[in-house]
Each structure stands twice: as structure tokens, then as C-alpha cells.
Amino acid sequence: MKADYESTDDELHEGTRLLCVFFSVYDLIVSRSKDKNMTNDDMFSFFSARKISKATLISLQQTSFLPDKPAFKNAVTDFLGMSELEIELAMGHIPAEYRKSYYDNISHIAMLLQKSTDDNVLREIKPFFETDIGKLYNGDCIEIMKGIPNSCVDLVFADPPFNLGKTYDPGIDDNMTMSKYINWTYEWLDQCIRILKPGGRIFIYNIPKWCTYIAAYLGEQLTFWDWIAVDMKFSLPIQNRLYPAHYALVSYIKGVKATTFNNQRISMQICRHCGGEIKDYGGYKSKMNPNGINVSDVWSDIYPVRHKSSKNREYNELSVKLLDRIICMSTNESDVVFDPFGGSGTTFAVAQLLKRRWIGSELGNCEIIKQRLLNPEKDKAQLDRIYQEKNHLFTEESKKIRRKNGFWLSEE
């Protein structure tokens, strides 16, 4: 992510009327500077005259609250021409001392915020590619979803760009301002929630930073199911931060109870040299289910697809094992799976092999996905290997080495 940029997004301002909630104080400042027809140099000069450096101002890029220091706070309010309360409201906050007034005026606020009924007019969009049970669309996921009826999919899985400044296919922006990224995220989440059936489940895969915003937003409309930590394997350290070791996979249910939950079991982790258990199960060994161990909310057995021979495209792609677990856990055959960010097509490939109907969109290159679906041999082979371990306490290979070295087996 860039430390600085020349301008904020046009979508974030129009005259002095705010078009969205701001999630970064810096984004709000830059937007107001454009309203004043100021250059970036003019903006930085204003704060420099008040002994606030450019670096200090830029530090507000990732901050959704006003600075504590009075001089800094006063400079921000003076530049914006807004009171502290107005800034809080622009950031989407309702200060504690004003919450009673807010609740006392809910009906009036609701009238002011009444949405147009024309937001989701169904439109006909031609699929890029179809199978006997699936449809792939090439285009912006929000526009694609506007053509999907309410409450018609059983599972939504989304792996959006993480906004880390990576290069993807033309048209995909992975370097948005904080405010634009979160507002865009909320926009496609609204559509995902709309098309999800009651009792259906939504999974969002992202870095923890963004999932804190996503979880808070989904929690206002859906029922929390789980926050799963997916071990990211071999990540690089970040200066002055804890070592990043997981991706977040947040899951919510539309309504109170999920329509479908199929328990997933995995094999016991053993030493590949001697066959001994890596984890001590103590006196519970005799009670262990021969079909395997229940999956927890920490998934350490999902490995990233990094080797070129295993990848379908140049960019990152998701593991077949990850999608198999999510789809099998949350759906049954003939249920409908939707993925707004198709990527390399892993969701669609797995759904096709598992006999789930599917709908998907991808803004970038869809030809890669089409060829993957037309040639499923590699994915089928991966799925076959996964099922050798799935729902078995020990694989056939681990049974051999454990038997050889005198370790217990569930059937003996």
C-alpha cells in the first residue's frame, strides 16, 4: 500500500456533499481539499504552518478517529471547517453522549435515508461460459448481482482483493484508499446478503484487518457463526508488528439457524518419520472417532497454492481443499453456490465436481476459468487425494508406519 497518493477518489466527494462514510481521517481531509480546489502542496502547507509535518498527516491514512493532541485536532477541525461532532458523524460514529438523541429520532432519520426502490432492477446479462450446472459471468460483481433475484443462493464465498497494492488483470484496483475500499466492500456485501437464502451461509476470506470491518458490518444484518483462522504458512515478518500467521475466514448465517451443517472430519496429524501423534490426546485415544477429528476454527492443514505446476494463473489462487471443506460443510448436492470474485475458478471447479449448482463472476480473465472447467482432470486428482485423508482418523499410509512402529490404531 502506498504511503502517499496524489488525490483521493472522485467517488468520495461532490462539492461539499459527502457521498459515503469515511473510514480514514486523511481521506476526509484530502476530499475536503479537493472541494476547496487546493493542491496537495497547499494542503500540506496548511498543516506545516501549524507545525504538523507531512509524515504526521499521512499517518492518519489508517486512522478513523481524531488525534488526541489539541493542536493537531484543532488544525484538522479548522481545515475541514467542521466541528468534532460533524467529523465523528462523517466517520460513521455516533458519540456516546448523542446516542439517546439518535434513538429518539429513529423514525425521522429513517425517512431521510429512505432508499430508492429502483436499486435492484433485474437485468439480463449473458454468461461468458456455462456448464450443465453453472454459469460464469465476466464483469463487475456488483452489476452481475443486481441481475440475480433475492434469496436464491445457499452459500456465498468471497475472496476479494486484499487492497495490498498487488497487480492483477486490467480493471482490478488493489490500491484504493481505506475509505473507498471499505465502502466498496459494503456495497458488494449488501448484494451478497440480498441474494442469500434464509438459513444460507456467507464466508468472507481476507486479512484480519479488513475482516474486523466486514464482521462488524455483517453482524448488523446476519447471525455470527464463526471466525476461522487459516494458517497462511511461510509469511514474511512485518516491522514493529506481530508475525502474521493467518488469514481470516469469517462466516455468518442469514437468519438464526443454518439450513445445512455437515460436520467435517480430518485425519490425525502424525510424524511422517515415526508415525507418532504430534498432539498428545492423553486418555481420550480410545474414544476417538475412527472417521477422524472434528474440524476446529483453526485450519492448519490448508496449504497455499504457490508452485507453478499446481497453479492455473500467474496470481495467487485458493486451495481446492479450502473450497471443498467450505462447500461440503455448508451445502448439499444441487444447492446453489455463488462466488463474486472468481479468480482462477477454484470455487467453480470444486462446486462442479461436488455436484453443486453454481453462479460466479470475475472482472479479469475468464478464459483461464473456462479452460479449467473444460479440463477438470487436475482438480479431480487433487480432490481424490483430499478424500483419502478426509473422514478417516488415519490414512492408509499412516496406518502402515504406525503399525510398523507399534503405535495404536483405532480399529485394533
Question: Predicted segment positions?
Answer:
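PRPP-dependent phosphoribosyltransferase catalytic core
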Residues: E367-E412
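Core catalytic lobe of class I
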Residues: K2-M111, E124-I368, S410
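Acidic, low-complexity intrinsically disordered tails
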Residues: L112-K115, K404
